[in-house]
A protein has these predicted regions:
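Non-cysteine beta-strand/loop elements that form the S-adenosyl-L-methionine
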Residues: 5-12, 83-89, 112, 133, ...
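N-terminal pre-domain/capping segments
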Residues: 1-125, 202, 300-344
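Glycine-enriched alpha-helix->loop->beta-strand junction motifs that scaffold or abut catalytic
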Residues: 42, 129, 201-203, 229-235
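N-terminal cationic-hydrophobic initiation segments that often serve targeting/anchoring roles
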Residues: 39, 73, 163-164, 196-200, ...
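Gly/Pro-rich active-site loop or hairpin
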Residues: 15-36, 146-152, 182-193, 206, ...
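Active-site beta-loop-alpha junctions enriched in small/polar residues
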Residues: 12-14, 51-53, 88-91, 136-138, ...
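Active-site acidic/histidine proton-transfer and metal-coordination neighborhood
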Residues: 67-71, 75-206, 216, 293-294, ...
Length: 344
């Protein structure tokens, strides 16, 4: 914990550099190796996909899944860490080629729900009630291929089944406007929280905001954070960065736009995010060109930048800023922010 915040990271955040145009550039690392790195860097928690906890999950019985989850719990405990989230990885399987909860094929929808319930069971074994739904394939390549209204109903139906499965589970929807789909059904936190209201227990359905996803939607991540926190529903956070409307870049936090990063920290500070107990996670990836020996630097650098920006946010002269606001002197306010970020 630094500056009062708890930090989390996922095993997929140490990746091998493959992109759609070329193969991997770094060797894969084992989970144990990654866990050692997380701990040494001062991370408090680990984010998991269901199959990060239980590899080849689809071929395993419910009992075997729980057993392997208990083994992971022990491993985490020995490292002095905890599981922050578990997320069903619903975008890899041949069953979910055309969507998971919103697939046109009822068998695919059933697969997605069954797998989500197993994810909740894994969470229970890990002592982790927060289930994240990144709705990767809940959208279309072709709008005429699905019915948008029906898709909302199907997502609500799926979430309701999860809520009924375990009364402790909380569902955090991670919105993203596109990629892998052309258009996604839950593109912003506003959409996620609106869907929450349709569910059987809206109090247990909230959101996870990712910087890059907000930017891909043409929105300011700080406003998205303020919006979710006005509802008390920002339950996790994926900080990273994104250079405009391109592919999802997952750059280190603050890498593309330091001022946008600063404003995200200001939003977290004014809303008391640290006090909610929720974690700050860095959903970041190394540049493909990164050498093996630097394969975790993007994460430690993100944490460093975060802590430095918390200091910048706390030392910002709010009184002077408010005076300029009252005087409608936004020119001076603009320069004040720039000079504060530049430092003395
Ligand atoms: C991809 C998402 C992805 C999720 C993760 C947790 O764009 O950000 O990394 O956060 O799979 O569900
Ligand atoms: Mg993410």
């Amino acid at each position: 914990m630094q500056a009062g915040y708890r930090f989390s990271i996922g095993p997929w955040n140490i990746s091998e550099g493959a992109d759609p145009y070329g193969p991997t550039t770094r060797a894969p690392k084992s989970f144990d190796w990654k866990l050692g790195k997380f701990k040494a860097a001062g991370f408090d928690a680990v984010m998991f996909h269901d199959d990060d906890v239980v590899p080849d999950i689809d071929g395993k019985s419910a009992e075997q899944i729980k057993k392997e989850a208990r083994e992971m719990k022990k491993k985490l405990g020995d490292a002095g860490m905890f599981a922050e989230i578990v997320a069903p990885r619903l975008w890899f399987s041949p069953n979910t080629i055309d969507g998971a909860y919103t697939s046109n094929d009822p068998k695919a929808r059933q697969y997605a729900i069954d797998r989500s319930l197993r994810t909740i069971d894994i969470g229970a074994e890990l002592d982790c009630d927060l289930i994240v739904l990144w709705l990767a394939r809940e959208g279309t390549y072709l709008r005429e291929s699905k019915d948008g209204r029906r898709s909302v109903e199907l997502i609500v139906e799926a979430v309701d089944k999860m809520l009924a499965h375990n009364p402790k589970a909380r569902i955090a929807i991670e919105p993203k406007p596109n990629e892998p789909m052309d258009h996604a059904y839950i593109p912003t936190i506003g959409h996620a929280l609106a869907v929450a209201q349709l569910c059987s227990d809206p109090k247990r359905v909230g959101g996870l905001i990712e910087t890059a996803h907000c930017i891909l939607a043409g929105l300011d991540p700080a406003d998205e954070i303020d919006f979710a926190m006005a509802f008390g529903k920002l339950w996790s956070l994926h900080l990273n960065d994104q250079n405009g409307l391109k592919f999802d870049q997952d750059k280190p936090f603050g890498s593309a736009n330091l001022r946008v990063a600063f404003n995200q920290i200001r939003a977290l500070e004014r809303n008391g995010y640290a006090k909610t107990g929720a974690c700050v996670a860095f959903d970041v990836h190394s540049f493909r060109a990164t050498k093996e020996e630097h394969c975790f630097d993007h994460a430690t650098n993100s944490m460093r930048t975060f802590v430095k920006l918390v200091e910048r946010a706390r030392s910002f002269d709010e009184k002077a800023a408010q005076k300029l606001v009252a005087d409608r002197n936004y020119q001076a306010l603009d320069q004040m922010v720039i000079e504060h970020l530049l430092g003395k």
